[in-house]
């Protein structure tokens, strides 16, 4: 109730982050989100456990900490609108409540709606898969959650490159500088291929030491080792996939990306059922994580 009641700040933060990145300023969103993360980390134990003068609010405390952090991020981003020295700063002097031509709304919906639908469907599919994983016990659920966080070393990096390439591609596409688009894609492709191969080597060759940082019981450790080995072989492909989606989105081709992603992501559910009945257990879900 608390989080959903003030979810508008989450929406505003995503919008402002996209606008800052589109005009070539990725430092401001980084600084704002870092401060929000630190604020959330500090407030969580204070409000959940009731340390010092703070009341013990438990779950409500976690929600309040999250919302407060989101408001902090929003405040920092608004502050940067007026203090950033980046030129041109398209956000400064923006009249939010002005009337705009109808074609602007049409173009925004044409580009943004497919991605929004894709994200919603992805969340629903993830919930179904999580329900399927829960049938294998607490260890499988723990590995699913922690394994995703370990893998974020790869996909968060790729996602950052995708955001940058999105803005870079859109700017040069508008300026009709197509050679720069190709050059930017090739450079990003090379960097992320190398990074993906490094992560692949780490996951495939060192799965037990990495898993041992998070798990100690034999069951969870065994599942985690299998998880890292299987997803390890796809890290370079996943990085290139996310980067390519960013480039195509910069060209306005979000519908194509969404259709492909929805079809292949949706295929995880019947494949998970098939592999589970084949006796692969929780490892079946891991195979589906391999992009």
Model-predicted regions and their roles:
Residues 1-6, 54-113, 169-234, 276-289:
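Short alpha-helical transmembrane segments in multi-pass integral membrane proteins
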Residues 2, 36, 69-73, 77, ...:
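Transmembrane helical elements of multi-pass membrane transporters/channels
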Residues 2, 6-11, 33-41:
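Transmembrane alpha-helical segments of multi-pass small-molecule transport proteins
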Residues 9, 36, 118-122, 158, ...:
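Alpha-helical transmembrane segments of multi-pass membrane transport proteins
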Residues 10-29, 130, 141-201, 205-207, ...:
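Small-residue-rich hydrophobic transmembrane alpha-helices
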Residues 28-57, 71-77, 199-203, 256-284:
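Alpha-helical transmembrane segments of multi-pass membrane transporters
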Residues 46-57, 120-153, 171, 209-218, ...:
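Helix-terminus/linker motif at the lipid-water interface of multi-pass membrane proteins
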